[in-house]
Amino acid sequence: MIDTNLLRVTVCDEGELEKSTTHFIGSRKIEPEQWITWASECKYLPESDAVALCATLIDRLSLEANVVPVSSPVTICGDIHGQFYDLLELFKTGGTVPNTKYVFMGDYVDRGHYSLETVTLLFCLLLKYPNQITLLRGNHESRRISNVYGFYDECQNKYGHGNVHKWFCKVFDVLPIGALIDESVLCVHGGLSPDIRTIDSLMLLDRAQEVPNKGPLCDIMWSDPDDDVEDWVISQRGAGFVFGAKVTEEFLMNNDLSLLCRSHQLVDEGFKYMFNEKLATVWSAPNYCYRCGNAAAVFEIDGNNRSTKYFNAVPDGSREKPDRVVAPYFL
């Protein structure tokens, strides 16, 4: 059973942000309405605003539990990977914030052309509507990965230095690592860990750090399910494990859960059930890396009702293409 005393509700009342569009951190104005307007137009914030945004979220998220409780109805989303215009298409498909409640399962940055604008928009929405959007940490929300696969270079190119990247990574450190929907569905980015048998154990991890190369925090970000595996196998990714139906069913039974929901792996159709519908993979980056040709999906939960909505990539003519090279990489 889950110790519900370990679950901390969101500490910031979004009503306080609704009362006024301007707030302060130190001497810096916090202007969520203006920031959302800019970010929705694929514009990144001035450096001082970006730092203020990050500092505010760090203070708030540091008080959150590792696994945050979420009530349905809610829409679950997978990897985005800097595909800003496809994120807008996702909102057209699933509904806008705050009209639709969302859980995003990580990997907002790297690979796509607009990692900075993508994560900025999501962070601004989180600031304005903390009870309507939950952002989990993925394996790309780390210094080690984002330094290499696009996000650091993008911040460097757009701001002229790496300071903003450092601030975003500080926010990444305190993003929750799981969401528990209706005390029945657990959402994480990657998968399970042989060192974590219960949600209570997951709650006790020290998440406020760089994602390590091994251990349970690493496993939650990096592990994958496999139909051909029964127990635990070391992953060929170089981090995490591959796990099977037996492991999944035992974890669900031990924690009185009905479903494990995750992302982390490209699914051509955008959504895939495994293990007799005990595990679901959601993928929300259509035409991944602008070449894979895959569809994308969002997964809707409303009590015992579950449904999937699919969407495709925005046509090339509807998106701008920056002059920048994406490093060859496929995780």
Swiss-Prot record:
<dbReference type="GO" id="GO:0000082">
    <property type="term" value="P:G1/S transition of mitotic cell cycle"/>
</dbReference>
<dbReference type="InterPro" id="IPR004843">
    <property type="entry name" value="Calcineurin-like_PHP_ApaH"/>
</dbReference>
<feature type="binding site">
    <location>
        <position position="139"/>
    </location>
    <ligand>
        <name>Mn(2+) 2</name>
    </ligand>
</feature>
<dbReference type="GO" id="GO:0045931">
    <property type="term" value="P:positive regulation of mitotic cell cycle"/>
</dbReference>
<protein>
    <recommendedName>
        <fullName>Serine/threonine-protein phosphatase 6 catalytic subunit</fullName>
        <ecNumber>3.1.3.16</ecNumber>
    </recommendedName>
</protein>
<keyword id="KW-0206">Cytoskeleton</keyword>
<keyword id="KW-0131">Cell cycle</keyword>
<dbReference type="GO" id="GO:0004722">
    <property type="term" value="F:protein serine/threonine phosphatase activity"/>
</dbReference>
<dbReference type="GO" id="GO:0000916">
    <property type="term" value="P:actomyosin contractile ring contraction"/>
</dbReference>
<dbReference type="GO" id="GO:0051653">
    <property type="term" value="P:spindle localization"/>
</dbReference>
<comment type="similarity">
    <text>Belongs to the PPP phosphatase family. PP-6 (PP-V) subfamily.</text>
</comment>
<dbReference type="Pfam" id="PF00149">
    <property type="entry name" value="Metallophos"/>
</dbReference>
<keyword id="KW-0479">Metal-binding</keyword>
<feature type="binding site">
    <location>
        <position position="264"/>
    </location>
    <ligand>
        <name>Mn(2+) 2</name>
    </ligand>
</feature>
<comment type="subunit">
    <text>Forms a complex composed of catalytic subunit pph-6 and regulatory subunit saps-1; the interaction increases pph-6 and saps-1 protein stability.</text>
</comment>
<dbReference type="InterPro" id="IPR006186">
    <property type="entry name" value="Ser/Thr-sp_prot-phosphatase"/>
</dbReference>
<keyword id="KW-0904">Protein phosphatase</keyword>
<dbReference type="GO" id="GO:0046872">
    <property type="term" value="F:metal ion binding"/>
</dbReference>
<feature type="binding site">
    <location>
        <position position="107"/>
    </location>
    <ligand>
        <name>Mn(2+) 1</name>
    </ligand>
</feature>
<dbReference type="GO" id="GO:0040001">
    <property type="term" value="P:establishment of mitotic spindle localization"/>
</dbReference>
<feature type="binding site">
    <location>
        <position position="189"/>
    </location>
    <ligand>
        <name>Mn(2+) 2</name>
    </ligand>
</feature>
<feature type="active site" description="Proton donor">
    <location>
        <position position="140"/>
    </location>
</feature>
<feature type="binding site">
    <location>
        <position position="107"/>
    </location>
    <ligand>
        <name>Mn(2+) 2</name>
    </ligand>
</feature>
<dbReference type="GO" id="GO:0030590">
    <property type="term" value="P:first cell cycle pseudocleavage"/>
</dbReference>
<keyword id="KW-0464">Manganese</keyword>
<comment type="function">
    <text>Catalytic subunit of protein phosphatase 6 (PP6). In complex with saps-1, promotes actomyosin contractility during cytokinesis by regulating the organization of cortical non-muscle myosin II nmy-2 and thus contributing to correct spindle positioning. Also required for the proper generation of pulling forces on spindle poles during anaphase by regulating the cortical localization of gpr-1, gpr-2 and lin-5.</text>
</comment>
<keyword id="KW-0378">Hydrolase</keyword>
<dbReference type="GO" id="GO:1903293">
    <property type="term" value="C:phosphatase complex"/>
</dbReference>
<dbReference type="GO" id="GO:0005938">
    <property type="term" value="C:cell cortex"/>
</dbReference>
<feature type="binding site">
    <location>
        <position position="81"/>
    </location>
    <ligand>
        <name>Mn(2+) 1</name>
    </ligand>
</feature>
<dbReference type="InterPro" id="IPR029052">
    <property type="entry name" value="Metallo-depent_PP-like"/>
</dbReference>
<dbReference type="GO" id="GO:0005737">
    <property type="term" value="C:cytoplasm"/>
</dbReference>
<dbReference type="GO" id="GO:0000235">
    <property type="term" value="C:astral microtubule"/>
</dbReference>
<keyword id="KW-0963">Cytoplasm</keyword>
<dbReference type="GO" id="GO:0030866">
    <property type="term" value="P:cortical actin cytoskeleton organization"/>
</dbReference>
<feature type="binding site">
    <location>
        <position position="79"/>
    </location>
    <ligand>
        <name>Mn(2+) 1</name>
    </ligand>
</feature>
<dbReference type="InterPro" id="IPR047129">
    <property type="entry name" value="PPA2-like"/>
</dbReference>
<dbReference type="GO" id="GO:0000922">
    <property type="term" value="C:spindle pole"/>
</dbReference>
